[in-house]
Design a protein with these regions (language model features):
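Short strand-turn motif at the edge of the Rossmann-like AdoMet-binding core
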Residues: 15-20, 45-47
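Short acidic/polar active-site loop segments enriched in Thr and Asp
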Residues: 10-11, 63
Length: 182
């Protein structure tokens, strides 16, 4: 298993925030490889954050997790979800509903944060995913809800640029050298 994942053999590995591999087998393989070699794989939170609370809730019980993404119609251009009518619509329109795994197979570079969040919570097959086209919208708005009886977390992150994804890598790198980790 480790031969195909050489990056984990030479130290800790920090994948880019665009983790977009919904395959549970791949996830298990790299996890086992890191374990065999005494390494850790650090997944930056990218554009969303909140992996700690998602993981905590999922550890407490069978979490119900949903992921809602709002995007401008221009950002959907060139994808299977794009329809020309989205450019002239005056109201928000749902263009996808399914699992995070299904969403990433259709839009691997547009909703990659959903896979990272689903790995931290209920799993790609179990996260309920919806994508909406919003007229005139610039950027992305991601709303993640995870809940079990007695506990509910809602994360709502809007960003007009992808700069937050790069800074999430900086945050992970700082944690690697800091005596206090957030």
């Amino acid at each position: 298993a480790c031969a195909s994942h050489k990056g984990t053999n030479h130290g800790s590995y920090l994948p880019a925030p665009q983790i977009s591999h919904p395959d549970e087998t791949f996830y298990r393989e790299i996890s086992e490889c890191a374990k065999e070699n005494g390494r850790k794989i650090h997944i930056a939170s990218g554009a969303i954050g909140g992996f700690d609370v998602l993981r905590t809730i999922s550890l407490m019980g069978q979490a119900q997790t949903s992921f809602r993404t709002k995007k401008g119609p221009k950002s959907l251009s060139g994808t299977p979800l794009f329809e020309e009518s989205l450019m002239t619509d005056r109201e928000e329109k749902q263009v996808f509903h399914g699992s995070a795994k299904e969403a990433i197979s259709i839009l691997p570079t547009k909703v990659n944060v959903a896979i990272a969040a689903s790995l931290a919570s209920s799993g790609p097959e179990n996260v309920d995913m919806s994508i909406f086209s919003v007229p005139e919208m610039v950027g992305d708005d991601h709303k993640i809800t995870a809940q079990i009886p007695g506990v509910k977390a809602e994360l709502d992150i809007y960003s007009s640029t992808s700069a937050i994804a790069g800074w999430s890598v900086v945050a992970v790198l700082r944690n690697l050298v800091s005596p206090i980790v957030f």
